[in-house]
Amino acid sequence: MIKFQVVNLNYKKVRFIKYYFTPLVILTWLASSTSFAQAATPTKSTPVKSITDVITNVQRDWLSDDGQFLLTLYSGVWNPHGTLFYLKQRGGVSVEGFQKGLDVTLKSYDPEVGLEAPPEYTIAGKINLRNNTMVGRVTHYPENKAKISIRKTNFTPAIPIKGAYPQFVFEYYGYDNPTGYSSIITRVDVINKDTKAVVQSLTGFKANSYSTNYADMNYDGYLDLMLDIGEELHDDNYAYWLYEPKTKRFVRDKTLGAIKGYPSRYPHKRQLHLNKDALLERVNGQWKKMPCCYAD
């Protein structure tokens, strides 16, 4: 048997999950995985069905009340993960952990060493979805163990908004892809979480269904929906539906959608890094191309 390494393309993060395939299964998988969203073209008779196994990754951006950190976290999944950025010096640390209900536990780690190494920081807290906050405690483990510190910390929105946060859930519809393992999303219904009413339907695309990202892509404090519309395995093309608070609707953004590359977010600098030639900074509601190649 052969150990197979699976890459989660949505996060741009390698997940070392051990799958055991026969050589025949591997060859079949490779052949079927070379094409994604455009591999299966629906006909008039292709039924559109509900796709229930889509993972919606909610990425939240929080400032600590002591002004030390910005925590950007993929939540709403069993293994929340993200980055704890330092605000009073350059850099930050990766964090990963577990989520049960609204309770989150995280620990920092060095990606080059792995999760087995002792953490520098641990975070435990409870998320409040209504006001987009997390109350918890941060424990620091310096090299000098005598100086371990524990501090109660309130994490509040990095970019606050006026009024209440929209409470949405998403329902996905599309069709089976006979040449791949994921279905194809052709419609997203935006549901008011409180009233259960459909407030908008997003159409006009073919997206891969393994996961979607719900994050503040244009740094206005509101979460936006990002869909993977890549046709090939390494085709980093995405559709961005940005939330407009004035109209209370999602609008597809052509500027970001025209740039190839997975967006790494740096909320404390209002920057998006999409590829080696595209580092953008949000200035006065507009994107400005930065001359350098890396954010931090």
Which stretches of residues belong to each language-model region?
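Surface-exposed beta-loop interaction hotspot
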Residues: 139-177
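Acidic/hydrophobic-patterned starts of short beta strands in beta-sheet-rich repeat architectures
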Residues: 169, 218-229
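Central antiparallel beta-sheet cores of small beta-barrel/beta-sandwich binding domains
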Residues: 42-153, 191-194, 198-205
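Short aromatic loop motif centered on NTY/YTY
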Residues: 227-229, 239-240, 249-296
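Short glycine/acidic-enriched loop and turn motifs that connect beta-strands
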Residues: 141-143, 231-234
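Repeat-based blade/solenoid architectures
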Residues: 202-211, 259-265
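N-terminal secretory signal peptides that target proteins for export/translocation
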Residues: 1-17
